[in-house]
């Protein structure tokens, strides 16, 4: 099965962030903003370590009732979050996709693009 990849990029304010993308290029997890490349790379390592275990995911709903999930590290800090989904089942599919793709070691660095 083809794995996805991490896309390391710069946010508009010059901070670093990453997306985990599935093999179909869809973003399945978005990180917080990091002040340094090294911190963002540590965030990727944390997703690789924690993203394969369903107990590290927490389901939530936004104010419009749309479900989404967050991925937490073992210290309970948020590592990344999903988009908003149309149903809890769709959000669960998103978790399954993160679990299937988190271990990838492919990192596409587009900070220089």
Swiss-Prot record:
Chain positions of Sequence repeats: 11-59, 62-110
Signal peptide interval: none
SUPFAM superfamilies registered for this protein in UniProt: YegP-like
InterPro entries, sorted: DUF1508 (IPR010879), UPF0339_domain (IPR051141), YegP-like_sf (IPR036913)
Keyword Repeat found: yes
Family statement: Belongs to the UPF0339 family. Duplicated subfamily.
Name of the protein this chain belongs to: UPF0339 protein MS1092
